Amino acid sequence: MTKLRTGRQKYYDAFSHIYDLFIKVHAHNYKDETRRFLVDSARLEDKRQPKVLDICCGTGSVILSFAEQFSDVLAIGYDFSLGMLHKANAKELSDKVIFVMGDASSLSFGNDCFDIVCCSHALYELKGQDRKKALFEMKRVVKPDGKVLIMEHEVPRKKLIKMLFYIRMLIMGPKDSREFLKKGIIPFQEIFTNVTLSHTRSGKSKLVICRK
């Protein structure tokens, strides 16, 4: 493991202590709306025992929402930060989720395993090469009739939150992260055959829906 990756892990381990507060400030009243939007977009109501993988799951808010909504789901949260996973494991319903420590660019699963693979507000923080590898890995592990759901930020409108957003991106985001966000769905169209884009009602986040 490189010194850079170890350093990033230490950063996220430390950030895990204030992560939920940061999201609360950024999302304000739209936090639950954003999660519901992602979970509803999975359209798993008619699927028996669906399998869902949440990449870069952080403190587990999204994958725990899947576990709450679908009683028979096999829900797996995947993150390379032990600190984030500890926070996730301490939350309500965590006993219904399997949390795994690992690298998004090298998933420890076989091909065509999951009905849904999702990644919420984290892909832009990966380095360009790792980001591309992670997308190919998501494509590999999702079922042929499954979906990859990528939720990303729209640039915040409020001046203070916008400033904090760019400061965090400057500190830990790779050099191409702003460019990646500006490109919209183009990076996804280079990997997946079918890509569509939708937005939350609040306009704070966008959802990229990808199929093999």
Predicted segment positions?
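Conserved class I S-adenosyl-L-methionine
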Residues: 1-44, 65, 165-166
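Class I SAM-dependent methyltransferase SAM/SAH-binding core
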Residues: 53-55, 59-106
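A short acidic, Gly/Pro-enriched loop at the edge of an enzyme's catalytic core
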Residues: 105-117
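A short glycine-rich, Lys/Arg-flanked "PGG" loop and its adjoining helix->strand segment in the class I
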Residues: 132-144
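C-terminal lobe and adjacent flexible extensions of AdoMet/dcAdoMet transferase-like proteins
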Residues: 208-212
